[in-house]
């Protein structure tokens, strides 16, 4: 067995674990992006599956909002020129109808995103 010099020992003790930690960090960030990307639906994140009515007009809404069937009103973060469609999930696609309940698929609070990310980390990375 060869005797390592002081420079080789320094490299083995500090640089090796640093490279491993960087690779592990990059891998975890990639997995997190992959998990969060599953929830992305054309600039929206599916937070709740509550039936809701989305308010829209032919012009830009003053306060874009969605009201669930129980009367709770959510202000939507991503306003568009008009709300003419609501995403109903992968099997059903977009609902272009103007009548009946819609499914709320817009992020209403940044805290929901943080809770979602923490939930994913705790569920898929229990060692963290």
UniProtKB/Swiss-Prot annotation:
It comes from Murine coronavirus (strain A59). The chain crosses the membrane at residues 12-32. Pfam families: Corona_NS4. This is Non-structural protein 4. It comes from the Viruses. Belongs to the coronaviruses ns4/ns4.8 protein family. InterPro entries: Corona_NS4. Keywords: Host membrane, Membrane, Transmembrane, Transmembrane helix. It is a single-pass membrane protein. The lineage of its organism: Viruses, Riboviria, Orthornavirae, Pisuviricota, Pisoniviricetes. GO terms for cellular component: host cell membrane; membrane. It is found in: Host membrane.
């Amino acid at each position: 067995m060869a005797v390592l010099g002081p420079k080789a020992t320094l490299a083995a003790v500090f640089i090796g674990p640093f490279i491993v930690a960087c690779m592990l960090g990059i891998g975890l960030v990639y997995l997190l992006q992959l998990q969060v990307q599953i929830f992305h639906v054309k600039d929206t994140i599916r937070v709740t599956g509550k039936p809701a009515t989305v308010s829209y007009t032919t012009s830009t809404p003053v306060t874009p909002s969605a009201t669930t069937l129980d009367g709770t009103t959510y202000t939507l973060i991503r306003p568009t020129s008009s709300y003419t469609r609501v995403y109903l999930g992968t099997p059903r696609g977009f609902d272009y109808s103007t009548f009946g309940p819609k499914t709320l698929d817009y992020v209403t609070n940044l805290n929901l995103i943080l809770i979602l990310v923490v939930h994913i980390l705790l569920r898929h990375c229990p060692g963290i």
